[in-house]
A protein has these predicted regions:
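Structural motif
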Residues: 52, 75, 144-148
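Short secondary-structure boundary segments
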Residues: 16-28, 32, 87-102
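Extended amphipathic secondary-structure runs
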Residues: 54, 60-62, 67-68, 136, ...
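Cofactor-binding active-site loop characterized by glycine-rich and histidine/acidic residues
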Residues: 92-257
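Short acidic, glycine/serine/threonine-rich loops at helix termini
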Residues: 10, 25-27, 31-36, 65, ...
Length: 257
């Protein structure tokens, strides 16, 4: 019910399977959306965007957690088959609508739920709190995550043969790196993953430094390398710096550096 909804996003926050998600749409995105989409002005005050909370009826497990947590009773459970026309709306939003400038901060319940979940539609039980926590972590850190999974429920829904509920960000194409050790040593296993990642990164930096400090290196490459090193321990700042360095290294490689 878009009139009753206060847009707190708590329903998406508790969803075990990432099947209910909020979106903010621009004017062009609204025009391109299916005609049956339910929209509302943003709250607590209107903005240039329209708000919608969309559900994937084919993936919803019917646990009712969203109804339980909703503070204003804006969600109603109805038979799945009656909501078939909502699936194209959800699919359109997932494929075409992303975060916008000026959205609530990622470190808030409301703001975090506008981030793409990188854990979705898993085989965990309906209402499983474990996947709710794991999904939230991927929304905050998923593009930079290394997961050393302990053997248990999370290894069953997290890594079933031939499928994976973990995915990649649709823009960056990056997502969690997942592995599971059967020997009840995931702490040691995870430490090994971290050490290995650090060694590989140090080797990559050393190789980039050779190119960036050579006589053939351009001023742009040197600046990009310096920025990368300066921000290497700041994930948010280092992400664009890494992309810029890779672009300059590719140019240098093409020029024979």
């Amino acid at each position: 019910n878009p009139e009753a909804c206060i847009q707190c996003n708590q329903c998406a926050f508790v969803c075990s399977h990432a099947t209910i998600r909020p979106f903010m749409l621009s004017e062009d995105e609204v025009k391109a959306a299916p005609s049956n989409i339910k929209l509302a002005d943003t709250k607590p005050k209107a903005s240039e965007y329209k708000y919608t909370m969309s559900v994937s009826p084919l993936d919803c497990m019917g646990c009712g957690e969203c109804i339980t947590v909703c503070p204003v009773g804006a969600i109603e459970m109805v038979p799945q088959e009656s909501q078939a026309e909502e699936q194209p709306v959800f699919d359109y939003l997932v494929a075409n609508v992303g975060k916008k400038p000026g959205m609530p901060a990622d470190n808030t319940v409301k703001g975090s739920q506008f981030n793409q979940p990188l854990l979705e539609f898993s085989g965990s039980c309906a209402g499983c709190a474990e996947t709710s926590y794991a999904r939230l972590i991927t929304q905050l850190f998923g593009e930079h995550m290394y997961i050393s999974n302990a053997t248990g429920c999370s290894s069953i829904w997290g890594g079933p043969a031939a499928t994976s509920p973990y995915t990649v960000n649709k823009d960056s194409k990056k997502g969690p790196a997942w592995a599971n050790s059967l020997f009840e040593d995931n702490a040691e296993h995870g430490l090994g993953m971290e050490i290995g990642q650090k060694v590989l990164r140090e080797q990559a930096i050393a190789s980039a430094e050779k190119c960036a400090t050579s006589d053939k290196a351009s001023a742009e490459l040197k600046a990009a390398f310096d920025k990368f090193v300066e921000t290497k321990n700041d994930t948010k700042a280092n992400t664009p710096a890494a992309a810029a360095l890779v672009a300059e290294l590719e140019k240098a490689a093409a020029a024979g550096c």
